[in-house]
């Protein structure tokens, strides 16, 4: 946890923060934020920028950002710990696994935009004066989004919807809030999902998860033409972000009698999902195509 940077070792099992949620391994992010705040930290969750990240680093603050994942991980958090002005690279650190990176600013920003450029800052309370006159975009609504995610994983679906409706009332241009809302409506098989996802991509045309959500929605509705269309749009934005999306598009393509396209997708699925539990079944299916 970034609190270690400030010399504070907070046990993850304190106050039950390490409890598991449905479909989530370990604690969710809002639990860690709440725990840090109980130990005297202040948090800010907002839409950032490359310039803002550099400003925080110059202030001695290591910001956390939400960026695309890879293979079976749809997204993850990374810490920006520095930057190289000559090479125009951002220096990043991911605690698990223990890895560092030096990512070109253009590439970093391109990927970061896919999730709304979310920035999380955790600082000791005696440093909050640094943010006194800051106008942080989506600060309140992003916090609500994180709280809604907790409710969602606790099974309180309608509580999460209520939270997210509040978030979009506060900030109608918050793409994260609209996409999360779309995700819940998608789980409920509600047509409201389409409305929310379309609002998301109108605000942010590069919002990968919204296009993927639309693909999932139409796949369930057996509208395979639209399912393939939206999965393809996701893949165009980032072809390496989430291996299982190729299997979903393969299903749609099979229904559209595009066997060659489905075969290509299943091969990519296995390449990009090294731990696929259905590898044997997929390999058998490939032999039939």
Located regions from the model:
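Conserved active-site-adjacent core of cysteine acyl-enzyme catalytic domains
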Residues: 3-5, 9-10, 14-123, 131, ...
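Alpha-helical segment of the N-proximal tetratricopeptide repeat
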Residues: 133-176, 180-187
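Helix-start (N-cap) detector for alpha-helical repeat units in TPR-like alpha-solenoids
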Residues: 141, 175-176, 208-209, 242-244, ...
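Structural signature of tandem alpha-helical TPR/SEL1-like repeats
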Residues: 155-162, 187-199, 221-233, 257-265, ...
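Structural marker of alpha-solenoid helical repeat scaffolds
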Residues: 170, 203, 237-238, 272
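Canonical tetratricopeptide repeat
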Residues: 180, 213, 247-248, 282-285
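Terminal, low-structured helical/coil segments at or just beyond the last alpha-helical repeat
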Residues: 255, 260-289
